[in-house]
Regions:
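Extended catalytic core of nucleotide-activated donor transferases of GT-like folds
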Residues: 9-12, 24-111, 120-123
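Aromatic "clamp/platform" in nucleotide-sugar-dependent glycosyltransferases that forms part
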Residues: 227
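Short alpha-helical segment that forms part of, or immediately flanks, the ligand-binding pocket
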Residues: 213, 236-240, 251-255
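Conserved acidic donor-binding segment of nucleotide-sugar-dependent glycosyltransferases
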Residues: 259-269, 277-282
Length: 346
């Protein structure tokens, strides 16, 4: 299939475009030599297409990620998602308001399925009459890198100062009572001085993924203090690295961190004591991290993720009413070869 999407989440897109399809990534026009935000990733099956060139592209299905993209697709391609071209909506987030009362922007549409990234998110949103599905996260395996040589706590959070209570940034001083906390992520530097020097919290400059993984794996334990977000890819990456994890028992963390693969609780003191135990017992930390890696590979590996997406895309296109069919064979990064029937607009 040829799939259109906007590459708005680099980490998620990095996993998604490793399948066996063709990926048309909508980007703004740039001058020669400027960064289009896509080319630097080295994706083999994905190509950046300027917005003003989308009308000439043949597209089999659209993966929407923001409400405004529905109108954008019509404006830029002349085709209405759900009517003139198969489409689905990938929802990355938890509800922004009260979970029991927040209606999804596509809740009144039957023609565009909503794909959630966690079971918690599907449960929490009011999806109305829209068809729904869940494709759980999958991440490329960075490999077993854990050494835990530094008696420090690692956490990855983007924009920790702005997102504050949402990401549990306010909780970091509690954990800094046990050991220095190194905060990685976009705009982590904005935490400099926020705690007034009262806590051993060290922002780390934003690092490219490979270096981030290597540096993170040197820390003794990974902390996931997020109160209200979708399951962070950084938590799954830490588990893939072989790190022991300590996580708030919120949103999807209770599913991701299975018994014996880390410590999950809503009691911050209990989590703080777990951090202390991992710091003092490196052999136990290594053992728990190894079990966590095994669990992450089995449940959040790339092959499973891509196979589930293959199923969802095939079902979406097959269910679209205004179509004729053609057969395509493709192989995803997990080695699975699939023959599928793809619909094309009349």
């Amino acid at each position: 299939m040829r799939i259109l999407l906007w590459p708005i989440h680099g980490g998620y897109t990095d996993a998604f475009v490793r399948g066996g399809h063709e990926y048309v990534l909508a980007v703004r026009s740039v001058r020669p030599g400027e960064d289009d935000g896509v080319s630097g990733w080295g994706w083999e099956r994905a190509r950046a297409v300027p917005l003003d060139a989308l009308r000439a592209e043949h597209i089999d299905v659209v993966v929407l990620q923001r409400p405004e993209e529905i109108a954008l697709v019509e404006q830029l391609t002349g085709r209405v998602p759900g009517r003139d071209i198969p489409a689905l909506y990938l929802e990355h987030n938890t509800p922004g308001g009260p979970a029991v009362a927040t209606r999804h922007p596509l809740a009144d549409r039957r023609d565009i399925p909503i794909v959630h990234v966690t079971h918690f998110n599907r449960l929490s949103w009011d999806n109305g009459v829209a068809p729904t599905a869940v494709v759980e996260h999958g991440v490329p395996d960075p490999g077993q890198r854990y050494s835990g040589e530094l008696e420090r706590v690692g956490v990855v959070v983007n924009e920790p100062a702005r997102r504050w209570r949402t990401t549990g940034t306010d909780l970091l001083p509690e954990f800094a009572r046990e050991a220095p906390v190194d905060v990685f992520g976009i705009d982590a530097g904005k935490l400099q001085g926020v705690f007034g020097g009262r806590a051993a919290i060290e922002p780390v400059e934003s690092l490219p993924p490979d270096r981030l993984h290597s540096e993170l794996a040197r820390r003794r334990v990974y902390l996931h203090p997020f109160r209200w977000t979708s399951l962070g890819l950084s938590l799954l990456e830490a588990m893939h690295l072989g790190m022991p994890v300590v996580a708030l028992a919120t949103t999807e963390a209770v599913r991701a961190v299975a018994a014996g693969t880390g410590v999950v609780s809503t009691d911050v003191d209990e989590l703080r004591l777990a951090v202390r135990a991992f710091l003092h017992e490196p052999d136990w930390a290594r053992e728990v991290g190894a079990r966590g890696r095994e669990h992450a590979l089995a449940h959040y590996g790339l092959a499973t993720f891509l196979a589930r997406w293959d199923d969802i895309l095939t079902e979406t296109v097959a269910a679209w009413p205004l179509s004729r069919t053609a057969t395509h064979t493709y192989a995803n990064a997990g080695g699975k070869t699939t023959t599928t029937t793809v619909a094309h607009a009349r």
